[in-house]
UniProtKB/Swiss-Prot annotation:
GO terms for cellular component: helical viral capsid. This is Capsid protein. It is found in: Virion. InterPro entries: Coat_protein_tricho/vitivirus. Keywords: Capsid protein, Helical capsid protein, Virion.
Amino acid sequence: MAHYAKRVEIRAIIEELVLAKAQPTDDASESGYDRNMYLNTLFGYIALVGTSKKAIHYGEVDIVGPKASKKTGIDPRGKMVVSELVGRMRTLSVAVSEGPVKGATLRQMCEPFAQNAYDFLVVMAEMGTYSQLATKMTRSGFKEPQVMFDFASGLDLKALTLQEATVIQAMHSRLFRTEGAKGVFNAQSSIGEQAVEI
């Protein structure tokens, strides 16, 4: 329960941060954008490239509207600069002295917005755009591209299909193997450097 409460707190803080300069409207059925469109676009674009420190995030992008489809395009409703908003999130995690975002990674700050990313990736997959993870893990990525992002652990498991849950499990298994291999490599490098110093 504490994990859920922390996730809710993180969502409230990050939502306030990223929407600070945004101008959402209450009725965006024909023009403009609402909070959900804005959050779907932001976290969807983050999901496309990942949350790694090495990830190069998008610059200025169109906010994707509700009529987006392969036939009509993305139904642009405004602009946002994804890399700037990611920078604000990272800065916040090192600037605060207490609270749930203190020292949080970008992935941890994005997890409460996993459903927003999922909704965005469903639309993007229809248009032929997939996350980097989906293109790397093509066998799984081809089946359920909308769950192929590194903060998918924030999704509600009960809302997923069995196929989506299976793909997430395979993806997380691969990520853990990769992280484990990096840890071993870093440890070996560290030991090698110490031996040279002696």
